[in-house]
C-alpha cells in the first residue's frame, strides 16, 4: 500500500504540470500558424522535404495558379468589311540588300490592318521576281507596278540628284493608277497614304487616318534633325503652322509619312501630282498638297497632333566587306 500511495502522489503532482505545459505550448504556436496561413508562403518560409517529388510540392502550393493554355487562331489579313473605307498604301521601293527585309517587316504590319490595299511601285524597268514573290506570299490585297527613274536624274549608281527626291515617279504612277482604276465621280470610300518601306508604323495610325474627309495630318518622329516634327494646332483644333526648324514657312512643312488624302479628292483633282522638276528639297509634299487643300482644310489626328504614331526609321546599311569582288556566298540565295 505505501508504494501505491507514493505512485498516486507522483501522478497527482506531475499530471497538472503536464497539462499546464501542453496548454501553454499550444497557445504560443497557434497565433503563428494563423498568421502564416493568411500570408503567401515564400521559399524562405516553406521548403520541400528532402527527397520529395518537386512536382508534388508545386501541386500542393495554393499560391501557384495553374496556367490554362488556350490556342488562338488569327486570320491574316482580317476579313474584308463592307462598311470600312479602304486604305490605299502607296510604297515606292528599289533594289538593295535590305529591300526584302524592309518589305517583309512592313507587310507584317499591314497584315493587321483591315480593308487595306497595298500599291507597291518598283523603281525598275520591270517587276522583279523578288518583290513579286514576296507580295504574292503575304496574302495581302496588292497591286504591283514599276517605273524606272530616268538615268539623267541619277548621279551614279544608287545616288540621286537631291533635287529629285527618291520615289517621285513611283508615287505619281500610283496616283495615275488610282485615277485610271476608279471613275472620277466614284462613291468608293477610301484613303490614300504614302508609306515608305523603311518607316515604322503604329497600327493605331491606320485607324486614325481611315476617317479622313479631305487631308489628315499628324506628327512624324526622327525627321528634320529633331525628335519629331508636327503640325501646330491651336485651341480650336485647327492647324495654324508647323513645328519644324527646316524652312518652317513652306506651304506644307510636313514629312511624306505625316498625311493622308481622301481618295475622292485624289480622283476629283486629276491635275494633282508630285512635281518632278523645279521643286526644292523639302517641297515635294507641298507640290501635291497645295493642289488639293489649304492650311485651313487640314484635319489634325493623333490626339490633336500630340501622339507619335509613325517613325522615320532607317535600316543600317549592311557591311558586306567579306563578300569580296566575286562574292563569297551563293548569289542565287535570296536575302
UniProtKB/Swiss-Prot annotation:
Per the UniProt entry, the glycosylated residues are 141, 185, 304
Q: How does it sit in the membrane?
A: Single-pass type II membrane protein
* Record-listed E.C. numbers: 2.4.1.135
One Gene Ontology cellular component term attached to this UniProt record is: endoplasmic reticulum membrane
Q: This protein is called what? A: Galactosylgalactosylxylosylprotein 3-beta-glucuronosyltransferase 1
Pathway participation? Protein modification; protein glycosylation
What organism is listed for this UniProt entry?
Canis lupus familiaris
UniProt topological domain (Lumenal) ranges: 28-335
